[in-house]
């Protein structure tokens, strides 16, 4: 497919009767640079937001080499594009088979969880691995999000400390994570997290 200066030009020229991707690679480049210049922490691209190979390659080309993956298919996609990218399996509900394959077949060491049951699955599926990086996802208020996920994922704050202590016994690195909800438009939500 060709390049077009605007979406209108594409529509007028092709008159498609099927969905069309309009990828603005320069905008991706600018966005990655903005993040890198303004965010002091590690930047992970959440593959589920858009698993298009061209987009992922552009993100990699601009210096992002760590990815939030939510499924084995996303892990396989990243392995195909950049086998040495660092992957973080951040979905809190995973099958033992997915955990095992992620760990043994693709070298994923970083996993998110929000329950003792998920910790047990991770430990069993990795044969009690000693090099795990575990992230306890804590449920926070999603009051400013279009889609509130606070009741779906995350350990309750009252249970989180015990889970963090338990994970400390089984992890090389330990962290916490939270999700402010989908389409969150208020930066205060990040401060509350």
Predicted regions and their residues:
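A charged N-terminal "starter" segment
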Residues: 1-132, 165-172, 188
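Short acidic/polar capping segments at secondary-structure boundaries
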Residues: 93-95, 116-119, 139-143, 181-183
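Active-site loop/helix belt of alpha/beta enzymes
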Residues: 125, 140-193
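ATP-grasp fold ATP-binding core
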Residues: 133-139
């Amino acid at each position: 497919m060709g390049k077009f200066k605007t979406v209108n030009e594409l529509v007028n020229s092709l008159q498609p009767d099927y969905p069309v991707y309009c990828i603005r690679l320069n905008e991706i480049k600018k966005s990655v640079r903005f993040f890198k210049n303004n965010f002091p922490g590690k930047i992970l691209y959440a593959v589920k937001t858009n698993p298009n190979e061209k987009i992922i390659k552009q993100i990699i080309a601009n210096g992002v080499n760590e990815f939030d993956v939510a499924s084995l298919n996303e892990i396989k996609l990243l392995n195909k594009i950049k086998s040495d990218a660092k992957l973080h399996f951040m979905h809190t509900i995973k099958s033992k088979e997915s955990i095992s394959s992620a760990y043994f077949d693709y070298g994923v060491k970083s996993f998110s969880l929000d329950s003792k049951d998920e910790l047990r699955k991770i430990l069993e599926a990795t044969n009690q691995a000693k090099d795990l990086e575990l992230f306890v996802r804590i449920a926070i208020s999603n009051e400013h999000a279009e889609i509130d996920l606070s009741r779906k994922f995350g350990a309750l704050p009252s249970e989180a400390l015990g889970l963090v202590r338990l994970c400390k016994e089984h992890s090389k690195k330990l962290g916490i994570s939270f999700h402010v909800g989908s389409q969150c438009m208020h930066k205060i939500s990040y401060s509350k997290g």
